[in-house]
Design a protein with these regions (language model features):
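Terminal amphipathic alpha-helical/low-complexity segments used for targeting or macromolecular assembly
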Residues: 1-7, 12, 18-19, 55, ...
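Structural signal for interior beta-strand "rungs" in well-ordered beta-sheet cores
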Residues: 3-185, 189
């Protein structure tokens, strides 16, 4: 039997697993399904259509599934809603908005950690095992791969893709795609690749060396970008290289390299760390 605080308000088609705990002043509206082991600490607002998987913990002030911040979106339109996987943590005042589309929901994967005041806008697609520091912002339709880490105040432009294993530094902005395992150290400025993260993730030394080589081709080379892509294609056949090539060739907003906004101090620090 779910534990529901007497001050909580549930209205609509609400489906709760038997061990769900709902704290004081929570509000659940519309078609909402909450999976086993979920806990709503207090003052959490859930708006359907919303599917919340198992083992998610939501802290006070979280608002999940409300209408997009899109002036052309009718407030009462449901659309495809929001789908959240398992084992996620949403700290205080995290917001996730439902999709504008009818065929694909806003989607959050498994085991992600959203620190306080993070925001995932409408139609965002987020993978698994990510960590987003306070005030990280993902604009509409952004796509985020697995094991991405952001510093506080990082911002991602609409439709931008962040490849798996990438890192975005605090207060950094991305209006171009960030390749898998790259590190963003200033706005659209790649400062290196995530060697430590790859080691911690169990990648073999040969895999790390391959990513280092691809980083050199994409970021440090000064030949036209089409020639860089051609050089990448000579590495095809390795799973990491194939993933990387597909990511680069699939870009619609361009790839972050070393032509972004970086102070001389940060640029020098990045160069020393290579």
């Amino acid at each position: 039997m779910p534990k529901i605080h007497p001050t909580a308000v549930l209205s609509g088609d609400i489906e709760l697993a038997d061990d769900v705990e709902i704290g004081p002043h929570c509000v659940l509206s519309g078609k909402v399904r909450v999976g086993a082991g979920c806990g709503l600490v207090g003052a959490v607002h859930l708006q359907g259509p919303l599917v919340l998987g198992a083992g998610n913990i939501l802290y006070p002030g979280c608002a999940i599934g409300f209408a997009p911040q899109d002036k052309g979106f009718a407030f009462h339109k449901e659309g495809a809603g929001t789908v959240v996987g398992d084992g996620n943590i949403f700290r205080e005042h995290v917001t996730v908005h439902r999709a504008t589309r009818d065929d694909r929901p806003t989607r959050i994967g498994d085991r992600n950690y959203f620190m306080a005041c993070s925001h995932a806008a409408h139609d965002v697609q987020i993978g698994n095992d990510c960590v987003f520091a306070n005030n990280t912002l993902f604009a509409g339709h952004a796509e985020v791969g697995d094991r991405v880490v952001t510093g506080g105040g990082a911002g991602v432009h609409q439709f931008v893709r962040i490849g798996r294993g990438a890192m975005l530094g605090g207060l950094c902005g991305a209006s171009k795609d960030v390749c898998p395992f790259f590190t963003l150290s200033a706005t659209n400025y790649i400062g290196g690749f995530n060697r430590i993260g790859m080691k911690r993730g169990g990648f073999a030394p040969a895999d790390i060396d391959l990513v280092r080589e691809m980083y050199g081709i994409v970021v440090r080379s000064r030949v036209p970008f089409s020639q860089r892509v051609a050089r990448l294609e000579t590495l095809a056949g390795h799973p990491l290289a194939d993933e990387f090539i597909a990511f680069v060739k699939g870009s619609k907003r361009g790839i972050s390299t070393r032509h972004g906004r970086a102070t001389s101090t940060r640029a020098a620090a990045s160069a020393e760390g290579e």
